[in-house]
Design a protein with these regions (language model features):
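Conserved, structured core segments of small domains
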Residues: 1-100
């Protein structure tokens, strides 16, 4: 099993204050999408972070060793062309997991 830190960077610094109705709907779809992966056991935790420099969300995901983590966001609503979101994925060198 491999673990990854995922950072989702918003399209603009003011996103949390001025998202449009369409963007708000997209974020609700994004949350539901990640919850579906959580139900499968691939998402450990996810959510928005109060970073004054730039709005972002983080998640910790786990994938079988032979699975490319990109499979998770290929259908994520926020990763559709034109949304302006960027994703950064960092493999964790080791992971200490509750209950292990």
């Amino acid at each position: 099993m491999k673990y990854y830190l995922v950072r989702l960077l918003a399209p603009r610094a003011t996103f949390m204050q001025d998202m449009t109705a369409a963007e708000r709907t997209m974020m609700q779809e994004h949350s539901a999408y990640w919850r579906s992966w959580m139900a499968k056991g691939n998402v450990v935790v996810f959510g928005p972070v109060a970073d004054p420099a730039w709005p972002l969300g983080i998640g910790v995901i786990r994938m079988d060793d032979d699975v490319d983590p990109a499979v998770m966001w290929k259908d994520d609503p926020v990763m559709r062309p034109g949304t302006g979101f960027r994703i950064e994925v960092l493999p964790m060198l080791t992971a200490v997991v509750a209950g292990s």
